């Protein structure tokens, strides 16, 4: 199961690159981005609170809802697993209510959904979600930027390339390790 952490980190880097392409200025995006920045600045004043909320409570509650109830419920009702994973990831993305987090949450929700489907346990998605949120909270509170690649002083395309490689290799190894055999 250790392959899921590089897989998650890879998706985080890919997502970070894609989210960086969403405008933060303009008639629509500018005021929305300013509101979100102000809200996060206000939240960031309570270090213990932000870690408690984002690293402990959110992963636990959100994974129960989106993977444990929505995704599992759809699969139990006969929806194909791929469609259930996509739908629960989309709902997870929309739940985050702003374009920057929606894209990120959707993509990460895909990884969380696959991991939940393959492991049949909420523990791994909760740990991955906490891992993602810990990195985000740490960068928000301690970094110059919320971007992993910016904090490492790397061009964003390096982050994308590393992300794709990490995601692809670890996804392949995870799927190979967790393949399902059918008896005839």
Roles of regions detected by a PLM:
Residues 1-58, 76, 146:
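Juxtamembrane helix-loop-helix connectors linking adjacent transmembrane helices
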Residues 5-6, 51-56, 60, 86-90, ...:
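Residue-level signature of the transmembrane alpha-helical core
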Residues 7-14, 158-178:
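Hydrophobic core of alpha-helical transmembrane segments in multi-pass integral membrane proteins
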Residues 46-50, 54, 76-88, 121-124, ...:
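Membrane-interface starts of transmembrane alpha-helices
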Residues 60-65, 69-70, 94, 98, ...:
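Active-site His/Glu-centered metal-binding helix of metallohydrolases
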Residues 61-87, 114-121:
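Membrane-interface helix/loop boundary segments of multi-pass membrane proteins
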Residues 101-154:
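Functionally important transmembrane alpha-helices
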Residues 179-184:
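Short, Lys/Arg-enriched, Gly/Pro-containing loop segments at transmembrane-helix junctions
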